[in-house]
Amino acid sequence: MKIQAPKGTKDVLPEESYIWQYVESKFRQICKLYGYQEVRFPTFEYTELFQRGVGETTDIVQKEMYTFLDKGGRSITLRPEGTASVARLFIEHGFASRPMPQRLYYIISAFRYENTQGGRYREFHQFGIENFGSKSPVTDAEIISLSYNFFVSLGLDNIVVNINSIGCPVCRKDYVKNLKEYFLGYYDKLCPTCKQRLDKNPMRILDCKEDNCKLIAQDAPKPIEYLCDECKTHFEALKGYLDAAGVCYKVDPYIVRGLDYYTRTVFEIVDVVLDKELAICGGGRYDNLIEQIGGSSTPGIGFAIGVERLIMLLSQKGLIPQKPQVPQVFIATLGDLATKKAFEIASTLRFEGISTVIEELSRSLKSQMKYADKLGCDFAVIIGDDELEKGVCKVREMKTSSEEVVRIEGLAQHIKSKI
């Protein structure tokens, strides 16, 4: 057996984990600024939750979920996305009785069996936002503004928000009827999957990635042309709020998103380079989802950001920050007494917020210095019997190799003055 990670998964090594910590920190910061609180939930759920929540006709449910029977014979699925799980959490823990709206965010791994290309993985990571309890277009604008400003905070300056409205269940009936009639005229040219979608949910055809289906869909009826007065008013108000917030957006009448729970507002955020768009965020409103999976009627809206794709984009654009210096100090020891003292000194330095490691392998001083250099430490503190007797240590600046003799009790302040 070859020892390696399964196809479609990826290890995050120390030389890149700081990038993940950086974007996670930025996301937590923006969530805090907008008043959102973190939730955490299981990696797996009962399969029925995703069948009812995500939609039986979606590619996710039909083709991509990791589903198995547990030892009790229950059908379990590794979460393919976060919204359905947060909706279940909302119902199970009685969030409907809490002050509305409820603003929640999460950072998760998710799982889908799909082609591994262009920043896509079978285990991937998402940042997500869910807002429950408000139908107002103000909430839609806030959600979009949050995601937009998150990307701006990372230095992305070519991002555009593509927005659309797919209407409510009332006005969507006429749209779906006309859409079905349109695609029936091209039935023989549709891919096998879209032929099945035609009866169950013809809107899914608009989301098909097959070239022929994409070509046919270009002239299909647009959901925005069938909006009822209430949905039109909602969408116009959203555009006004986005204008007021200074968010760069355009209307894309063919965005429908790949999940069945969406209503009214749907959006994608893309990075534009040489007229090519890379989607880095997607979301929308889902006013019927909570009721659909067994809760009381509660409007909601949210989005998800693909972390792997985001990091890939930041790397391509040179927006990755410099790796922080960890550890800052290496304590080299000569002898058992020095090693014991090194523990004491290391504890003091760490208490002062200075990242410190000590020698553990009883190597020669030369080997220890080579190790400190490979770690990229700023300083090496050298302690031997002679230094212990005098209550001092040698502090070597690794970049210049210059050394100073410093009293041990003043070491922390000395190093802090140099950092």
Swiss-Prot record:
Any matching Pfam family: HGTP_anticodon
Recorded GO MF terms: ATP binding; catalytic activity, acting on a protein; histidine-tRNA ligase activity; transferase activity
GO (cellular component) term, any one: cytoplasm
EC number: 6.1.1.21
GO aspect biological process, one term: histidyl-tRNA aminoacylation
Oligomeric and partner information: Homodimer.
Keywords carried by this UniProt record: Aminoacyl-tRNA synthetase, ATP-binding, Cytoplasm, Ligase, Nucleotide-binding, Protein biosynthesis
Lineage top rank: taxon: Bacteria
Protein's cellular compartments: Cytoplasm
CDD domains: HisRS-like_core, HisRS_anticodon
UniProt record similarity statement: Belongs to the class-II aminoacyl-tRNA synthetase family.
InterPro entries (alphabetical): aa-tRNA-synth_II (IPR006195), aa-tRNA-synth_II/BPL/LPL (IPR045864), Anticodon-bd (IPR004154), Anticodon-bd_dom_sf (IPR036621), His-tRNA-ligase (IPR015807), HisRS-like_core (IPR041715), HisRS/HisZ (IPR004516), HisRS_anticodon (IPR033656)
Protein name: Histidine--tRNA ligase
SUPFAM superfamilies tied to this protein: Class II aaRS ABD-related (SSF52954), Class II aaRS and biotin synthetases (SSF55681)
Reactions catalysed according to its record: tRNA(His) + L-histidine + ATP = L-histidyl-tRNA(His) + AMP + diphosphate + H(+)
